[in-house]
Every structure is written in structure tokens, then in C-alpha cells.
């Protein structure tokens, strides 16, 4: 298992209170593969640095998790298929 950090930018037309439950359904991919979700941090609505699909605002969420590379790849694939997800970024933080 490796440690990953995923940042997701969602469409600002969504209600902020529905963001965490909707992300939780996607995170079941990680749980069924034997991984664990350590923390889900919803930053809320923020202005984008540049327009994405003619949108100037997005809802940011950061997720810390432990998972296999295959499970993270499947999660990223499912997030890309969702129309309300504007961008995703998966990183492996440096070990200190």
C-alpha cells in the first residue's frame, strides 16, 4: 500500500453539503480493494486560476488515502467519467 493525495475540483453548481457523500461513493473503490481513506477535506468554493469548461469557480476537495496503484488508477478513471468533476490530480507525497 502506498500513500496518495488526490485533489478534486468539482463543478460549482453542486451544493457543498453533497460533495462529501458523493465523493464517498467513489472512494468505495479504494475500500473494496483493501485500501483506506485517511482524510477527506472539502475546501469549499474557490475561484479558479483560469477557466475550465467556461467555469470560473469550483469546489475543491483533498483526499488522503492508502491504496494500491491499481485501485488509485481505477478511482481516477471513474472520477474522469463524472461530468461534475472538472479536474483531478493524484500525487504521492514525499516521505519525510
Curated annotation (Swiss-Prot):
- Could you list this entry's UniProt keywords, alphabetically sorted: Ribonucleoprotein, Ribosomal protein, RNA-binding, rRNA-binding
- Which domain of life does the protein's organism represent? Bacteria
Q: Quote the InterPro entries the UniProt record gives.
A: Ribosomal_bS6, Ribosomal_bS6_sf, Ribosomal_S6_plastid/chlpt, Transl_elong_EF1B/ribsomal_bS6
Q: Which GO terms describe its biological process?
A: translation
Q: Name one GO molecular function term.
A: structural constituent of ribosome
What are its GO cellular component terms? cytoplasm; ribonucleoprotein complex; ribosome
Q: What span is annotated as the signal peptide, if there is one?
A: none
Record-linked NCBIfam families = S6
Q: What does this protein do?
A: Binds together with bS18 to 16S ribosomal RNA.
Per the similarity annotation, which family is this? Answer: Belongs to the bacterial ribosomal protein bS6 family.
Protein name (Swiss-Prot/TrEMBL): Small ribosomal subunit protein bS6
Q: Which organism is it from?
A: Salinispora arenicola (strain CNS-205)
Amino acid at each position: 500500500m502506498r500513500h496518495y493525495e488526490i485533489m478534486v475540483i468539482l463543478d460549482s453548481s453542486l451544493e457543498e453539503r453533497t460533495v462529501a457523500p458523493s465523493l464517498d461513493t467513489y472512494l468505495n473503490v479504494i475500500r473494496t480493494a483493501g485500501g483506506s481513506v485517511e482524510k477527506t477535506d472539502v475546501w469549499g468554493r474557490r475561484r479558479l486560476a483560469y477557466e475550465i469548461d467556461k467555469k470560473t469557480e469550483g469546489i475543491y476537495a483533498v483526499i488522503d488515502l492508502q491504496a494500491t496503484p491499481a485501485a488509485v488508477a481505477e478511482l481516477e478513471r471513474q472520477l474522469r467519467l463524472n461530468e461534475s468533476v472538472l479536474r483531478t490530480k493524484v500525487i504521492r507525497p514525499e516521505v519525510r
